[in-house]
Amino acid sequence: LDNLDDLPRRCRRCVFWELDPVSRDRAAEAGDPALEKEAWISSTLLEWGSCGKIVYVDGAPAGYALFAPPLYVPRSVAFPTSPVSADAVLLMTAHVLPEFAGGGLGRMLVQGVAKDLTRRGVKAMEAFGDLKGETGSCMVPADYLLSVGFKTVRPHHRFPRLRLELKSVLSWREDVEVALERLLGSMTPEGALRPV
């Protein structure tokens, strides 16, 4: 929530995913969709936890991703390839600013989201891809999703649903680290380790 102002203006004011179409139109008429976005993020943070990532290059925001369980995303039921699978979290949007494109930041964003979700016990991430990939859209281009490891699970001529099994994103090293954490954690007396 502290970094919300670092989102590009178009995303900061966009509530395409966060509100149903009627509520979205009302927010636009009231003139403050950014306030609705902030309320949605705050509510999701309190109830579910972190729902976004921003990547910075030399202190400047270079890209972002927003994600949440489909239950928190009213628009997720409006697609011809709905619903999102019960064991998955929805990658709502992801974008790398043009001046930072081509440097692997998109892959890094998806890997960061995947690592976060894996720690929470989530099995997969799904997204509705946009085969037209229109500039300025809050939809994720399908070719981007495919390039970072997603597979099509429900084809469609415009909005296929794609899925990334989270185990496939973790490297061998990360698997070993997780196994060691589990092993050492299980041998630690309860109460010896406390959150800071």
List the model feature ranges, each with a label.
Residues 31, 43-50, 56-93, 139:
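Conserved acyl-donor/pantetheine-binding loop and adjacent beta-alpha core of acyl/acetyltransferases
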Residues 93-96, 102-118:
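Conserved acetyl-CoA-binding loop-helix of GNAT-fold acetyltransferases
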Residues 59, 131-132, 159:
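Conserved beta-strand edge residues that scaffold enzyme active sites
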Residues 104, 140-141:
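Glycine-rich phosphate-binding loop
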Residues 11-52, 56-57:
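Active-site rim helix/loop that mediates acceptor-substrate recognition in acyltransferases
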Residues 128, 142-163:
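Conserved catalytic-core motifs of GNAT/GCN5-like acyltransferases
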Residues 110, 117-136:
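Conserved GNAT acetyl-CoA-binding A-motif
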Residues 138, 154-194:
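C-terminal "cap" of GNAT-fold acetyltransferases
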